[in-house]
């Protein structure tokens, strides 16, 4: 998912 990548930064 796209959010998966964003959460990876967190």
From Swiss-Prot:
Keywords, in A-Z order: Amidation, Neuropeptide, Secreted
Source organism superkingdom: Eukaryota
Family: Belongs to the tachykinin family.
Keyword Coiled coil listed: no
UniProt keyword Secreted, yes or no: yes
Annotated GO CC locations: extracellular region
Database matches in InterPro entries: Tachy_Neuro_lke_CS
Residue numbers carrying Methionine amide: 10
Function description: Tachykinins are active peptides which excite neurons, evoke behavioral responses, are potent vasodilators and secretagogues, and contract (directly or indirectly) many smooth muscles.
One of the GO BP terms on file: neuropeptide signaling pathway
Organism: Scyliorhinus canicula (Small-spotted catshark)
Name of the protein this chain belongs to: Scyliorhinin-1
Location in or out of the cell: Secreted
Main location: secreted
